[in-house]
């Protein structure tokens, strides 16, 4: 029966070992994501007719980097592994164990954007609209890092593309990390960057990002394996879905308000 399904490629999570220092693929994916965001952000700044400078983008992405790292790790620990943290507080600093939470990273980025907007005397929603289209590609790379780490795999299935993950008991499972890489990474990236090709009401780009990510994450959660630390099969929705619902609702509200204010200003 196992011959009917794909075998996990079993890539070493450590890309490079230099003495006691280990360079993990997961970390490389995050660095590539930030590198791409920096390249695209500076390119957009140069074409912004002076609205943004490269120096301002540098400051925004530097603050955003720390917002993602600190918020993402703290969010992962407090949303999903708080019991483990109570037993082993140093677990918080072992990023390669358990990884990062998107929802925590989002909160960290919001704090970074608030701080940067204040320093640059800029409207918060203008900052949020600028950074939102830069994020999805890095999210997709992060999910590929999860795949390489043999973590966050999906539920048992008999679909032809099911993969037998070693840490998943070599049972055929949905490669849900790759589903997220495609939807939250590539698809959302093209949606947002297509949307901004025309001038849009301030705040609407950030709102669309929240709606898009929330919807895609909510859908993929139906294919991800339940986390026994926070969910059981009897639960109606998962922790990830519960955290995504406010994003969807909030994003819709932001878009409606943005278009309403834009309409009033043009009347």
Curated annotation (Swiss-Prot):
The chain crosses the membrane at residues 21-41, 60-80, 95-115, 203-223, 240-260. GO terms for biological process: lipoprotein biosynthetic process. Pathway: Protein modification; lipoprotein biosynthesis (diacylglyceryl transfer). It is a multi-pass membrane protein. Its main location: membrane. The keyword Transferase applies. Pfam families: LGT. It is found in: Cell inner membrane. Keywords: Cell inner membrane, Cell membrane, Membrane, Transferase, Transmembrane, Transmembrane helix. GO terms for cellular component: plasma membrane. It is an enzyme of class 2 (transferase). One of its GO terms (molecular function) is phosphatidylglycerol-prolipoprotein diacylglyceryl transferase activity. Its EC number is 2.5.1.145. A 1,2-diacyl-sn-glycero-3-phospho-(1'-sn-glycerol) binds at residue 143. Belongs to the Lgt family. Catalyzes the transfer of the diacylglyceryl group from phosphatidylglycerol to the sulfhydryl group of the N-terminal cysteine of a prolipoprotein, the first step in the formation of mature lipoproteins. This is Phosphatidylglycerol--prolipoprotein diacylglyceryl transferase. It comes from Glaesserella parasuis serovar 5 (strain SH0165) (Haemophilus parasuis).
């Amino acid at each position: 029966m196992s011959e009917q399904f794909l075998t996990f490629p079993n890539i070493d999570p450590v890309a490079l070992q230099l003495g006691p220092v280990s360079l993990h693929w997961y970390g490389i994916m995050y660095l590539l994501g930030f590198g791409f965001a920096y390249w695209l952000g500076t390119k957009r700044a140069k074409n912004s007719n002076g609205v943004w400078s490269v120096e301002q983008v540098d400051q925004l992405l530097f603050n955003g980097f720390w917002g993602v790292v600190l918020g993402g790790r703290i969010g992962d620990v407090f949303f999903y592994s708080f019991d483990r943290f109570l037993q082993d507080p140093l677990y918080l600093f072992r990023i390669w164990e358990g990884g990062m939470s998107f929802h925590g990273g989002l909160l960290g980025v919001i704090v970074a954007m608030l701080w940067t907007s204040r320093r640059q005397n800029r409207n918060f929603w203008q900052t949020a609209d600028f950074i939102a289209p830069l994020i999805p590609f890095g999210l997709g790379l992060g999910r590929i890092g999860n795949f390489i780490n043999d973590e966050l795999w999906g539920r048992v299935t008999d679909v032809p593309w099911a993969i037998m993950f070693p840490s998943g008991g070599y049972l055929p499972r949905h490669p849900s990390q790759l589903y997220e890489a495609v939807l939250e990474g590539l698809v959302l990236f093209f949606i947002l960057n297509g949307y901004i090709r025309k001038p849009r009401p301030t705040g609407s780009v950030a709102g669309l990002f929240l709606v898009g990510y929330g919807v895609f994450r909510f859908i993929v959660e139906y294919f991800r394996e339940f986390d026994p630390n926070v969910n059981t099969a009897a639960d109606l929705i998962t922790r990830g879905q519960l955290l995504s619902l406010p994003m969807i609702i909030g994003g819709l509200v932001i878009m409606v308000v943005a278009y309403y204010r834009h309409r009033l200003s043009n009347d």
